[in-house]
A protein has these predicted regions:
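Short loop/turn segments immediately following beta-strands, especially the blade-tip
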Residues: 26-32
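Tryptophan-centered short beta-strand motifs
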Residues: 34-42
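Short, small-residue-biased leader/transition segments that mark boundaries at the very start
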Residues: 3-4
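Low-complexity, serine/threonine/proline-enriched polar segments
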Residues: 45-159
Length: 174
């Protein structure tokens, strides 16, 4: 099974705990060693589905003080907060320390949520997508991780799944 993939990325997913990430790749065409050539998304099982939103943006705002939630607003009008959970993390806040501006925006593809909260325990079940995402308990796993913390789990990727930013297929790939 592992020979079907050109590369893999290690995550820590296990059944009920997928945190899927979309993988982007770039070939250094101009040879300058900088990430300034065209980037390609490696499509996964959700590519092309009506629930999948391309060119989605989320802007995050620096909290006014330590141990505060981080506000966010998305390009489709949704908004909310990234809750500060002091029981699980010790950093001052979740806003990236290396960003000096008071807000930053991420642009990419948004997958439909598959998170379900158990009404009795309060725990969240983060269900997997079929294939094509890092840190996802899908059917593209090269190695399954620990059932306790997912350590050692890896997803496989094919460069032939690369698509342009607008979602069109790359032509002429081997």
């Amino acid at each position: 099974y592992t020979t079907l993939f050109r590369s893999c990325i290690q995550g820590n997913a296990f059944d009920g705990s997928s945190e899927p990430g979309i993988v982007w790749v770039m070939q250094d065409i101009n040879g300058n060693g900088l990430p300034d050539d065209e980037w390609y998304e490696l499509k996964g099982s959700e590519a092309g589905k009506k629930e999948t939103i391309r060119n989605f943006e989320v802007t995050y705002y620096r909290p006014e003080g330590k141990k505060m939630d981080v506000q966010w607003i998305s390009s489709d009008g949704r908004n909310g907060w990234v809750d500060y959970l002091s029981a699980y993390h010790t950093q001052d806040y979740y806003y990236p320390a290396w960003i000096t501006e008071n807000s930053y925006t991420l642009t990419g593809t948004c997958l439909a949520s598959r998170n379900i909260q158990d009404s009795q325990t309060g725990y969240w079940d983060n269900q997997a997508y079929d294939w094509g995402y890092v840190d996802n308990f899908g059917n593209d796993q090269i190695e399954g991780g620990s059932t306790v913390d997912g350590s050692g789990q890896r997803n496989g990727f094919k460069i032939s799944n690369a698509i342009h930013v607008d979602g069109t297929e790359e032509i002429g790939r081997a």
